[in-house]
Amino acid sequence: MSSPPSRRSSGADPLRLERSIPAEALDAIRAPFLSAGAAPVDAPVLQPLGLLLDLAGEAMRSRLFVVSGDGGEEACLRPDFTVAVARQHLSSGAASGRYLYEGKAFRVAPRGSDRAEEFLQIGVEAFEAADPVAADAEIAALAWAGAAAGGRDDLTLLLGDVGLFAAFVDSLDLTPPLGARLKRTFSRPRQLKAELEGDAAPAAATERSRIAALLAGLPEAEAAAVLQELWSLAGIEPVGGRRPAEIAHRLVEKAEVVKAGRLSANQADKVRAFLAVSDAPEAALDAIAALAGPNRAPLDAAIEGWRKRLAGMVAGGVPAERLVLNAAFGRAFGYYDGYLFEVRSAALGEERPVAAGGRYDGLPARLGSETKTGAVGCMVRPARAYAGGGE
């Protein structure tokens, strides 16, 4: 037995449902997905809470409906299907697979919002070693076809790419620790702002710490042992219940931030200019290419891949004039590690995407897979796609 789901942010009211849509409209929206060559799958509604938070980030907790089991373990109602389907694929032992799902997902609406909290999604998740650029184009075109089948004439396909930002950062020829740190901030606006303003590396405070500098070159277990020995020699007992390993970890982190360095003013300006790019894709790619640093080969390769991806989308039926590439576009779910997109309606606004998807090649490994394969998928919200609906 499990306790009822707890509402993280809006009291104990029943889940807010979305509007139903006519059967013929749902059939039209579903049709492109039925022709995508995917096997139907029924993913479990309950998913491990800890796993979702590890993958999506602690900030996602407030959007999840949590269920506590008799054994004390916590689960949540699936907020989407990607992780649930990926787990099923891995448990099957298949080297590759393409799956079609249709079912309800659940998210707590933001306080004061009228968004539905239980809503229908139709989608495809593909775990294949095929050409990733071609697969990306196919999946984006599939999402567009499903979204457009609802009859809306105000749709835009917004594109972004975590990998494009990574390639741009590589072009700047930063120290490896600084480059890695900057890449991690892409979907964390406050941390990114701190990097750009030079607040992420408080040199004056940490460079004075000789202990931190000493520990920085040691493995963490060894650093903890050294710290424990120093305390013993000085007759000091740590306060607050913090263990030597925890304190050593924080000291090492601080020292490594200093060693990694900061962005120069010119580099920070380039990053700001990159993040400001939002235009028709070809113009956006030209603007990004003009910002490349001295090590431009990775960025040039990423841009060439994007030109092929765009050609594939247009060939797959996406109108070129409906495409927008936004260099700063990211998603709340931290497991997306490549290109990503949303189909947006002008009438519904950016907070209510009609369809969404992207590439998450790293997710299977994070779920325990030892086989490296591509992973990409998309979903559509039929109630939003339907021209006579909305939520």
Predicted regions and their residues:
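Acidic, His- and aromatic-enriched active-site or binding-groove loops in soluble protein domains
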Residues: 61-71, 173-207
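Short low-complexity, flexible loop/linker segments enriched in glycine and/or proline
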Residues: 55-59, 171-173, 339-341
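Positively charged, Gly/Ser-enriched RNA/tRNA-binding surfaces
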Residues: 2-4, 18-37, 41, 47-48, ...
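Polyanion/phosphate-binding surface patch
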Residues: 44-75, 115
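Proline- and acidic/polar-enriched loop/turn elements at helix boundaries
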Residues: 45-46, 159, 181, 325
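Glycine-/proline-rich flexible loop or hinge segments
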Residues: 9-16, 61-74, 122-127
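Internal, well-ordered domain-core segments that constitute the primary functional module
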Residues: 121-194
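Electropositive, surface-exposed helix/loop patches at the edges of structured domains
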Residues: 74-94, 191-205
